[in-house]
């Protein structure tokens, strides 16, 4: 019989609530408590999910002996500190991306995880998307030979508000970081060099905050392969998520996911559904799957499928992209931490 995993959720925003819904459907997982700085506002919602208690102090969850695992869904600025404290409390940890805006803080958090022997999974949910998993399997099985080129298109349907942008860490840390992780995951090689170009073309006011909303990033891998990622904060037709890998024996591509596969053809037009508009619709399956794999890693005492090191490496690429954009030149990952920025 599978031992039940008792969890606590830190942060009851959009992603925290999504995890609560998904965990509630897993028989061998239970949510005991939720922490949110505005605990009173979530009481009725928490009651509807049979949560034992809510609190405004996340440390109450860390001190609860019944809780086995913590889900960190709070703002990025406090992720690393919460990881360290959760590790010290011997709690397994699921942390949303990125681990931190600081590579040093990320390394310190991972050191705490290793020291206390707990499980850490970083929330790069796209690894668990069935379309992208299929691409990964095709590459691993050698069906397209040696991969040489990777193309990722990742475009949001509408830009975030200015208040969000102020604390987001910027396009590369907030949005592109998913694509940086996907690039490593699919190609199976570490990135050695990053060259990023970008501008605030959708909303010029982003530039006043030192951010961009449109970017093209070129990655070079240790094995010599290359990747091109294009990002935009606004694709008016929907949530545009496409991947293509080209290799010595062929190519593999994942197109956009749509509400239906129906295509209407007449003498005047060919029409099909637009891509899903919202990321929670597009990646619904992946959000469910990542939690199942986290629970499996805890139950079997195995490494998670998206480790703390995966979070660190994606963060290093994001940092290099920031530096490349600022200096207008390619940046070596090896030198990322050494560049004054």
From Swiss-Prot:
It comes from the Bacteria. Keywords: Oxidoreductase. The keyword Oxidoreductase applies. GO terms for molecular function: nucleotide binding; oxidoreductase activity. Its EC number is 1.-.-.-. Belongs to the Gfo/Idh/MocA family. NCBIfam families: myo_inos_iolG (TIGR04380). This is Uncharacterized oxidoreductase YrbE.
